[in-house]
Amino acid sequence: MREYASDRVDLRSDTVTQPTESMREVMASAEVGDDVMGDDPTVNQLQDKVSKMLGKEAGLYVSSGTMGNAVAILAHTRPGDEIVAYTKSHIFRYEGGGYASLAGCSM
């Protein structure tokens, strides 16, 4: 693993973050609910805030860029469509044709 200066925050992945003790305390005391059932107040507040900021009727929180890509592709394509992506894009290089398989599209 590459070494970085100690004054940098590494946000490449949630697997390399190091929460502080105060962050852990906030997480432990946070009000939570089942997001699948629409009962998580934090997710609901975030979706409402962002949809209002963007002037949209509603928002949908997705937990990763990968999930966002999947939602977008499934919303905008039908089986048999072609997905056009830059050859150096993450979706083309690292997703291994998963989206093409998921959506029934060619890449």
Where are these regions (language model features)?
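PLP-dependent aminotransferase-class I/II
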Residues: 102-107
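Short coil/turn segments
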Residues: 15-16
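Structured catalytic cores of enzymes that bind and process phosphorylated ligands/cofactors
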Residues: 2-4, 59, 78, 84, ...
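Pyridoxal 5′-phosphate
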Residues: 2, 8-11
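Buried hydrophobic packing segments
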Residues: 50, 68-76
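Conserved PLP-anchoring active-site segment centered on the Schiff-base-forming lysine
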Residues: 75-93
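A short, structure-level motif marking secondary-structure boundaries and short turns
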Residues: 8-9, 31-33, 81
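Conserved N-terminal alpha-helix of the aminotransferase class I/II PLP-enzyme fold
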Residues: 19-65, 87-93, 98-100
